[in-house]
């Protein structure tokens, strides 16, 4: 069952075929609950840290939380993209302003990866939008149902699948799109690292289930072995690197890559038990990672 909140409809969005529609399903309930519980715990755990310009710091943290909540509840692809950026952009400023000595290099790498992923996703979103059926107020629509039923050829679905998957794989991250993560985690302030590792990586996993599986089922079947292979390589590689780390943040980064690889591989098995396991793993991983601090 879905609970929809559609009390706000901006006319400019409506004429683009987009409505500000938020909803909750089983997966959304779990991740919004995790986000709602995690942030107060993070604030309590790091309350002894004296941040310069603390009001701006906590304001950006709360903006990140708002973006995460929106990602997990958006029932419209354009609204989803808006909240995706709303979650990512404050994280960049948190790391670049309040991070460690090498924060500039780390956040530059973070910016390049996330900007590339966002650009690829935006291209895919526009292409999908142009192939949706007309809505009541616009020629095309960004609504979930319209996107799910977009009229695309098999070849089009294949290359758009990769646009979305690379964008989501960068955020998870999945090997070989992971190289931004260890440096960013190490240089970011502890509270930001807790958000990045405990919650934000779930954005990519959630997005694969929410958008890729329903929109590109044939492409998922065609490329599942490639994705599972990359995920398994990432699991083994990251696990071996993690056990050699003497820095907690880098250990968390590499161990998260291994956990996310397991989740991604499970998703692409396309089995019900695999998806159920991913949902449990997402929640438990978030609790465990945040609890480590």
Whereabouts are the PLM-identified features?
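Transmembrane helix-loop-helix hairpins at membrane boundaries of multipass inner-membrane proteins
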Residues: 1-59, 138-149
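Hydrophobic transmembrane alpha-helices and their helix-loop junctions in integral membrane proteins
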Residues: 43-47, 66-78, 91-293
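Short phosphate-coordinating micro-motif centered on Lys-Gly-acidic
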Residues: 85
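Short, ordered loop/turn segments at secondary-structure junctions
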Residues: 82
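Short hydrophobic alpha-helical membrane-embedded segments
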Residues: 54-63, 253-257
């Amino acid at each position: 069952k879905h609970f929809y909140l559609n009390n706000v409809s901006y006319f400019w969005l409506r004429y683009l075929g987009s409505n500000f529609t938020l909803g909750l399903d089983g997966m959304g309930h779990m991740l919004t609950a995790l986000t709602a519980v995690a942030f107060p715990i993070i604030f309590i755990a790091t309350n002894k840290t004296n941040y310069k310009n603390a009001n701006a710091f906590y304001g950006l943290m709360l903006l990140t939380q708002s973006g995460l909540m929106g990602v997990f509840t958006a029932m419209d692809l354009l609204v989803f993209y808006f909240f995706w950026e709303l979650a990512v952009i404050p994280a960049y400023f948190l790391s670049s302003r309040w991070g460690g000595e090498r924060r500039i290099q780390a956040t530059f790498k973070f910016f390049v990866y996330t900007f590339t992923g966002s650009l690829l996703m935006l291209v895919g979103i526009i292409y999908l939008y142009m192939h949706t059926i007309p809505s009541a107020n616009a020629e095309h629509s960004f609504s979930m149902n319209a996107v799910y039923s977009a009229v695309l050829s098999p070849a089009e679905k294949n290359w758009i699948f990769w646009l979305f998957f690379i964008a989501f794989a960068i955020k998870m991250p999945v090997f070989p799109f992971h190289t931004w993560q260890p440096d960013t985690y190490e240089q970011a302030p502890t509270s930001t690292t807790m958000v990045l590792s405990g919650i934000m990586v779930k954005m990519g996993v959630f997005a694969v289930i929410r958008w890729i599986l329903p929109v590109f089922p044939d492409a998922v079947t065609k490329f599942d072995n490639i994705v599972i292979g990359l995920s398994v390589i990432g699991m083994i590689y990251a696990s071996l690197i993690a056990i050699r780390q003497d820095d907690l943040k880098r250990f968390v980064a590499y161990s998260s890559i291994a956990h996310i690889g397991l989740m991604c591989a499970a998703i692409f098995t396309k089995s019900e038990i695999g998806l159920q396991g991913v949902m449990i793993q997402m929640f438990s991983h978030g609790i465990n990672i945040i609890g480590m601090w």
